[in-house]
Amino acid sequence: MKILYPGTFDPLTNGHIDLIERAEKIFGNLVVAVLENTSKTPTFNLQRRIIQIKNSLSHLPNIEVISYSGLTVDCANELKANLILRGLRAMSDFEYELQIAHTNKSLNNDIETIFLSTNTNYSFLSSSLVKEVAKFGGEINHMVPPSVERDLKEYFK
């Protein structure tokens, strides 16, 4: 069974890492799929985000990191992944993620979406929030891994 954890990861946060570590314990392996979203202008380009993720997950040998563009369900089909993992911080996340899960299911009836609730330590955390704090010089060392912290400080210098 292949499990796909898709996202933009711009940037990767400690919340993402916690979810990946927990999923790896449950499922044994995971494919982290980094979206190249052409409708957004990311802070970090695709290659940089992949490097950040690989560096931050080097302690997890059963995690594969790939990139993709287009529909997540198409990426899952290409990988022959039948499960998509999503994290939920709040009820508002659930409403949005449920719509996406139903859409994916309508495009491929064999795809299932599994939701893991976020660790309460990271329930406030989002990539957008991290960038906002970093932009104004706030401390982000408890929000992101060290390599991402360095990259953000350099970016907003």
Curated annotation (Swiss-Prot):
Its cofactor is Mg(2+). Pathway: Cofactor biosynthesis; coenzyme A biosynthesis; CoA from (R)-pantothenate: step 4/5. Homohexamer. PANTHER family: PHOSPHOPANTETHEINE ADENYLYLTRANSFERASE. Belongs to the bacterial CoaD family. Reversibly transfers an adenylyl group from ATP to 4'-phosphopantetheine, yielding dephospho-CoA (dPCoA) and pyrophosphate. This is Phosphopantetheine adenylyltransferase. The lineage of its organism: Bacteria, Bacillati, Cyanobacteriota, Cyanophyceae, Synechococcales.
